[in-house]
Regions:
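Catalytic cores of nucleotide-sugar-dependent glycosyltransferases that transfer UDP/GDP/TDP-activated
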Residues: 1-165
Length: 165
């Protein structure tokens, strides 16, 4: 089974709260059970790669907010749990950690990776975490992609509410 684990933080590269711990531990545990799990996360300016070996494994374009945007994909093997992590890089949308466009852009980029088969790997399930990744299931359905989605809400207090505009 192939699982793509979409999340907005991943310990030890960037950790804001408990979700970063979950993003490190759960994929590692599933990998030991034989699941081909890969984590996908924004490559914020504040991400600390340190001495971890990273490789640029892809570059693609998406349409977002009426404009073309380029996204780079950087791959790292998680130093503790040995699963593959993909970091999506785009200076305009991922320089800031918090922003409504950050999450919309991230969701669109994740779905375009699958739609365009950028990684030459397709998930059976996308496990999305919290409101940050909440658009992904809707976009999967909109594009009729042959992928199941699962949403985990880790903290109901953070619902991602924002103005409609």
């Amino acid at each position: 089974m192939n699982v793509l684990f979409a999340v907005w933080e991943l310990d030890p590269f960037f950790k804001f709260g408990g979700l970063g711990d979950v993003a490190r531990a759960l994929p590692g545990s599933l990998k030991t059970l034989g699941v081909d799990i890969r984590v996908i996360v924004p490559y914020y300016k504040v991400v600390k790669m340190g001495r971890h070996k990273k490789a640029k494994v892809g570059k693609f374009q998406i349409d977002y907010a009426g404009k073309k945007a380029t996204v780079e994909i950087w791959e790292v093997v998680h130093p503790y749990k040995q699963f593959t992590a993909y970091f999506l890089k785009n200076a305009k949308y991922f320089d800031k950690i918090v922003g409504i466009d950050t999450w919309g852009f991230f969701g669109k980029a994740v779905v375009e990776i699958i739609k365009q088969n950028v990684l030459n790997w397709q998930p059976d399930i996308i496990h999305v975490n919290d409101s940050h990744c909440g658009l992904i299931p809707l976009l999967v359905k909109t594009y009729a992609l042959p992928v199941k989605t699962m949403l985990t809400i880790h903290n109901l207090a953070h619902q991602g509410k924002a103005p409609i505009d």
